[in-house]
Amino acid sequence: MSQMTKFEEDYQRLVLQWANDRNIIDGSDNIKQLLKTLTEAGEFIDAVVSEDVDEFVDAIGDQWVTLVIGMEQSGVTYQKALDSAMCIDTSDDSLKNDTVILYAISCIADGILKDDKALLAQGYGIYLHVLRNLKTSFTFGVAAAWNTIKDRKGKMVNGVFVKESDLKDGQ
């Protein structure tokens, strides 16, 4: 059984406070958060394909932030997600990280649609394990994501947080 690290606990607390301060937890829902996760997963896969190390590390942290917020919205604790994940050895070359991430996303989506917390926890847990298995890139990615968002301002638009730099005139 995998335990939540002090590093994860500290950054989870920071991210959840940041998300609460911006009304992302209550002003949105886990479906919209899953869409953000899908966007970040696409950026992760693009970084892998293009062998862009900086973007790869950035995408790891961004995915983690969306998962932490999604778990909070879904009522799934971080440790419950870690405990619920099926054992998938992502170091095995026959199971590529992107394939496992897509499976995890499908579990999360199915869990949302069925309002099934066990399935949600399993999907979040599998996804977390993939990111954690990336070792050093995981800690750098999470820290970099936090440093990017910690002072970010924006507003909720149709249940989605839009950063200030992306807001169009009149929004």
Give the residues covered by each predicted segment.
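Flexible "arm" and connector segments at domain edges
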Residues: M1-Q171
